[in-house]
Design a protein with these regions (language model features):
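Conserved glycine-rich cofactor-binding loop
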Residues: 45-46
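Conserved glycine-rich Rossmann-like NAD(P)H-binding loop of the short-chain dehydrogenase/reductase
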Residues: 61-77
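Rossmann-fold cofactor-recognition segment
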Residues: 81-109
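Active-site loop of short-chain dehydrogenase/reductase
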Residues: 124-125, 148-152, 188-201, 229-232
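Conserved mid-core segment of classical short-chain dehydrogenase/reductases
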Residues: 133-167
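Active-site helix of classical SDR
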Residues: 181, 213
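SDR active-site lid
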Residues: 225-303
């Protein structure tokens, strides 16, 4: 244990070296020109996924497939992307084709249909971005309706609430990324000279259901990176991001209340106002584009969060306290 701090210092010293080496890598677009790149964005009807669609439209890629569950929202994003294509400088994006497909990324039938549409339109796929997911804000005991229970007794119905919330979170945060990977990996491998797969993922402490389901998909894609080395897998993990992602939290539906306003008597969102202090969607989306371009594996936002993962091995109590402070969490 006494040697642990020296290992931490060594890791810190390596950060600038590794950063420099990363910037020396040849850019993906030097081998796969933007004008030939075919992109599918799952979860593109809102949030960061929508912003990513706008950014790729401005880059002038060959095609973008916008995928989301709501037909009206998908159609809206398609129109917005077409406007961005029209505004691109010197007609750079004039040939970009925008497809819109409504579907649930956890539904195999829906994803097979997306794949069929992409193959029919472009004959293959180069970039798959998994930006879809669901939110869950409460600790399990709060979901059970007994955040301050001192008796140690939680009833069957309360436990069932936790199971239902977890099942919904698993479907959106693990099954969806799994279905997407199984559906599109063969197409990526066989039709792209530089296949890339990006998972947008933010495991958050003090939110056990959300964090555990997000961690499951994170480890899934880390394993996929080993099993399919020809595909450049990027894992982008931003901290708090602006937007209304939390409003549809799966653990709020159980109580029939808003997860944001705490109408059920529990303050679900504890951290500072995400729309005031969180990352801007445009910043996160641009970082995703850069990660794919540079072939980066693990991207933490802010970068210091990555150091927190290292520090956790040598000083876990400190990291746990800081996580509690960030999310304004007090254990009962």
């Amino acid at each position: 244990m006494p040697r642990a701090p020296s290992y931490l210092l060594l890791a810190l010293a390596l950060v600038p070296i590794l950063t420099f080496l990363r910037t020396r890598r040849p850019k993906r677009s030097s081998k796969l020109p933007r004008a030939t790149e075919r992109v599918v964005i799952l979860g593109a009807s809102s949030g960061i996924g929508c912003t990513l669609a706008h950014q790729y439209a401005r880059l002038g890629v060959r095609g973008i497939c916008v995928v989301g569950r709501r037909v009206d929202k998908v159609a809206e994003v398609v129109q917005e992307c077409e406007v961005e294509v029209g505004k691109s400088k010197e007609g750079k994006g004039a040939k970009t084709e925008i497809l819109g497909v409504a579907g649930d990324f956890a539904d195999p039938g829906d994803m097979v249909e997306v794949r069929r549409r992409v193959e029919e339109a472009w004959g293959g796929l180069d970039t798959l971005i998994v930006a879809a997911g669901v939110s869950a804000l409460r600790p399990p005991m709060a979901v059970a309706g007994a955040p301050n229970s001192a008796s140690g007794s939680v009833g069957k119905d309360a436990i069932q609430h936790v199971v239902e919330a977890t099942s919904s979170a698993m479907r959106g945060n693990y099954v969806g990324p799994l279905v997407a990977a199984v559906t599109f990996i063969p197409l990526l491998q066989h039709t792209s000279p530089r296949p890339a797969l990006l998972l947008l993922n933010s495991p958050a402490p003090t939110r056990a259901i959300y964090a555990s389901t997000k961690a499951a998909s994170l480890h899934l894609y880390q394993s996929i990176a080993i099993e399919h080395p020809k595909i450049a897998v990027s894992l982008v993990m931003p901290s708090t991001v602006e937007g209304d992602f939390r409003r549809g939290a799966v653990d709020a539906a159980i109580f029939g209340a808003s997860s944001v306003d705490g109408a059920d008597g529990m303050s679900a969102v504890r951290e500072a106002d995400p729309n005031k202090y969180g990352f801007k969607r445009e910043v996160v989306a641009q970082r995703c584009v850069d990660a794919i371009e540079r072939g980066e594996k693990n991207v933490f936002m802010p970068w210091a969060v990555g150091l927190g993962h290292l520090l956790y091995w040598v000083w876990p109590a400190f990291v746990e306290r800081r996580a509690s402070v960030k999310y304004n969490f007090r254990a009962s």
